[in-house]
Regions:
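Catalytic cores of nucleic-acid endonucleases
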Residues: 7-14, 18, 23-34, 38, ...
Length: 104
């Protein structure tokens, strides 16, 4: 995405959440967005056919700009509060790709 570098951190986060929601919709999920800031969950997704429910924290992928690991994805880990309630991290790349492990 060309404009991605000109976005503020908040705008990048919002873009990633909308992109993740669109991706999940294509996978058959109904999306329920968050309604408050600083929530450990960004989206709740419920599969239309199976009823599988996911609690998701969306992360935009960041790449290391320097150092010996330059070019590597910066690893994100769920907070203790997120681990307690089984929140999954969903990674969103600048090109709009999404994945669960952030390694593609």
């Amino acid at each position: 995405m060309v404009l991605h570098s000109k976005m503020s951190k908040v705008m990048k986060g919002q873009w990633a959440e909308f992109t993740a929601a669109a991706w999940l919709i294509t996978k058959g999920y109904l999306i329920y967005p968050k309604h408050q800031d600083n929530d450990p969950i960004d989206l709740v997704a419920v599969h239309r056919n199976t009823g599988r429910t996911l609690k998701i924290d969306v992360k935009s992928v960041s790449i290391r700009a320097s150092g010996r690991r330059k070019g590597d994805r910066i690893n994100r880990v769920p907070s203790d509060a997120q681990k307690k309630i089984c929140v999954k991290l969903l990674y969103v790349y600048k090109d709009g790709r999404c994945d669960w492990n952030g390694k593609n």
